[in-house]
From Swiss-Prot:
Family: Belongs to the UPP synthase family.
Catalysed conversion reaction: 8 isopentenyl diphosphate + (2E,6E)-farnesyl diphosphate = di-trans,octa-cis-undecaprenyl diphosphate + 8 diphosphate
Organism of origin: Xylella fastidiosa (strain 9a5c)
Taxon lineage: Bacteria, Pseudomonadati, Pseudomonadota, Gammaproteobacteria, Lysobacterales
UniProt superkingdom: Bacteria
Active-site annotation: D21, N69 (proton acceptor)
Subunit structure: Homodimer.
Cofactor, how bound (note): Binds 2 magnesium ions per subunit.
UniProtKB keywords: Cell shape, Cell wall biogenesis/degradation, Magnesium, Metal-binding, Peptidoglycan synthesis, Transferase
Protein's job: Catalyzes the sequential condensation of isopentenyl diphosphate (IPP) with (2E,6E)-farnesyl diphosphate (E,E-FPP) to yield (2Z,6Z,10Z,14Z,18Z,22Z,26Z,30Z,34E,38E)-undecaprenyl diphosphate (di-trans,octa-cis-UPP). UPP is the precursor of glycosyl carrier lipid in the biosynthesis of bacterial cell wall polysaccharide components such as peptidoglycan and lipopolysaccharide.
Cofactor annotation: Mg(2+)
Family annotation (CDD domains): Cis_IPPS
Name of the protein this chain belongs to: Ditrans,polycis-undecaprenyl-diphosphate synthase ((2E,6E)-farnesyl-diphosphate specific)
GO biological process terms on file: cell wall organization; peptidoglycan biosynthetic process; polyprenol biosynthetic process; regulation of cell shape
InterPro entries from the UniProt entry: UPP_synth-like (IPR001441), UPP_synth-like_CS (IPR018520), UPP_synth-like_sf (IPR036424)
């Protein structure tokens, strides 16, 4: 499967990005530790992967751990790291068996060496899978993403490999996370919070946004189908007029 030749279905997103929000609050409302919510959140993530495989959605990007999440209580951060290692031990083999390609975006250098090794092994194991590309944003921030891309171009200019006037949106975008994938068609955030929280700031310029009050641990196929039904009813303009969209055809979505 060539990523840039994935057929466009105007009623079904090729690429969904999700902020999995509400694990801690879901647990606290039940007088349980926040870590209980994170465990339930992993199950919700797996349900979402199952749904995407069933529907033929080709790309799913999940915001698992932001660059700002390092400021949370140390015990919660440590739990998330330990849970991640255990997940890679059990879950990756199952994802591989089902044809899921696993990727990670974000700043890995802050993670424990053992966890980074698990990430690398997961990527290598699943690299040739094509049913679904699952990108996990870990220690990721949208501003950080843009800054690193700008820094890379600045280094090329300083080294004489690039002229400043050669820099344009396309070139900057090539240095961003998910550069080889089409931008997300749909962005979903759970828990009733209506903001994008520094997630994929560059990549979601023309993405359809959808918010739900459902907490992430309770997110399921019924809620996700509601999101897809809403998406199918929308007309994506990309800055064009109705007449221009009609002349190009509704399925003409920029890559």
């Amino acid at each position: 499967m060539q990523i840039n030749t994935i057929p466009v279905n105007p009623t079904l997103p090729r690429h969904i990005a999700i902020i999995m929000d509400g694990n801690g609050r879901w647990a606290e409302r039940r007088s349980r530790p926040r870590t209980t919510g994170h465990r339930a959140g992993v199950k919700a993530a797996m349900r979402t992967v199952d749904f995407c495989l069933e529907k033929g959605i080709k790309m799913l990007t999940l915001f698992a751990f932001s660059s700002e999440n390092w400021n949370r209580p140390a015990d919660e951060v440590n739990f998330l790291m330990e849970m991640s290692i255990k997940l890679f031990g059990r879950g990756i083999e199952e994802l591989h068996r089902r044809g899921v390609q696993v990727r990670f975006i974000g700043e890995r250098k802050r993670f424990d060496i053992a966890l980074v090794e698990h990430m690398t092994k997961a990527e290598h194991l699943t690299a040739n899978n094509q049913r679904l590309i699952l990108s996990l944003a870990v220690s990721y921030g949208g501003r950080q993403d843009i800054t690193m891309a700008a820094r890379a171009l600045a280094q090329d200019v300083a080294a004489g490999r690039l002229k400043p006037e050669q820099i344009d949106e396309d070139l900057l975008g090539q240095h961003m996370a998910l550069a080889d994938l089409p931008p997300p068609d749909m962005f979903i955030r759970t828990s009733g919070v209506i903001r994008i929280s520094n997630f994929l700031l560059w990549q979601i310029a023309y993405t359809e946004l959808w918010f739900t009050d459902v907490m992430w641990p309770e997110f399921n196929s019924t809620v996700l189908q509601q999101a897809l039904d809403d998406y199918a009813s929308r007309e994506r303009r990309f800055g064009l007029t109705n007449a221009q969209i009609a002349s190009r055809g509704k399925g003409s979505i920029p890559a």
